[in-house]
C-alpha cells in the first residue's frame, strides 16, 4: 500500500499541489520506530519493507504526471541500515521511470552514519533534506532519539558530498 503525506496527513493544499505536479510519498510503511512529541505518526514495530514499493512509487509518479516528487519516510531504527538501501532503490526506480521528474528526499538522520548517508547520496536524488525541526534547547523534549548537533553534521556531510542539502524548522515550538 502506498502512502502519501498529501492524503495520510490530510493536507489542505493537496489539490493545489497535485494540480502543480507535485506530491509527497512516505516509504517504509506507516509505523515509526521513534515517538517524537510533535508527530502524529503511529509508533511501534513496523512490518518489513515492501520490496515492490520502489517500483510502485515510481509508477504512481508516472501515472500522476508529477514534475516534482518528495519522498519521506518513517524512521526505521529496527533495520540494520535504517532503510538506506530501500531509499536508494526508490530513488533509482523513480529516476529510471521518470527521468524528468525532480526528486527530493527528506531523510532520517541514520544515526549520523555517513556510510548510510552515502547509500542515499549515490542514488542521486536532486535534493536531500533532513529536518532539524526545532531549536537545540528543546530538541531533547520533542525529538525522541534525534540530536540537534548530529542533524547539523548530517546536513554538513550531505553538502560536503556535493549534494543539494535542505532543512526545515517547525515554528511555534519554543
Predicted regions and their residues:
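Short, glycine/charged-rich beta-strand-loop motifs at protein surfaces that mediate ligand recognition
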Residues: 168-173
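Short, surface-exposed, charged loop/turn segments at secondary-structure junctions
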Residues: 142-146
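An N-cap/entry alpha-helix motif that binds or orients negatively charged groups
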Residues: 1-15
Amino acid at each position: 500500500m502506498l502512502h502519501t503525506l498529501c492524503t495520510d496527513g490530510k493536507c489542505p493544499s493537496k489539490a493545489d499541489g497535485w494540480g502543480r505536479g507535485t506530491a509527497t510519498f512516505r516509504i517504509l510503511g506507516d509505523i515509526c520506530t521513534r515517538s517524537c512529541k510533535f508527530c502524529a505518526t503511529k509508533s511501534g514495530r513496523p512490518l518489513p519493507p515492501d520490496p515492490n514499493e520502489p517500483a510502485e512509487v515510481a509508477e504512481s509518479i508516472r501515472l500522476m504526471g508529477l514534475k516534482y516528487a518528495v519522498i519521506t519516510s518513517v524512521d526505521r531504527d529496527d533495520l540494520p541500515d535504517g532503510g538506506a538501501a530501500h531509499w536508494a532503490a526508490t530513488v533509482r526506480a523513480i529516476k529510471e521511470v521518470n527521468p524528468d521528474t525532480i526528486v527530493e528526499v527528506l531523510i532520517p538522520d541514520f544515526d549520523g552514519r555517513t556510510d548510510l548517508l552515502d547509500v542515499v547520496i549515490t542514488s542521486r536524488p536532486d535534493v536531500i533534506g533532513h529536518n532539524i525541526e526545532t531549536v537545540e534547547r528543546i530538541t531533547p523534549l520533542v525529538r525522541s532519539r534525534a540530536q540537534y548537533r548530529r542533524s547539523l553534521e548530517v546536513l554538513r556531510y550531505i553538502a560536503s558530498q556535493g549534494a543539494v542539502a535542505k532543512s526545515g524548522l517547525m515554528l511555534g515550538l519554543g
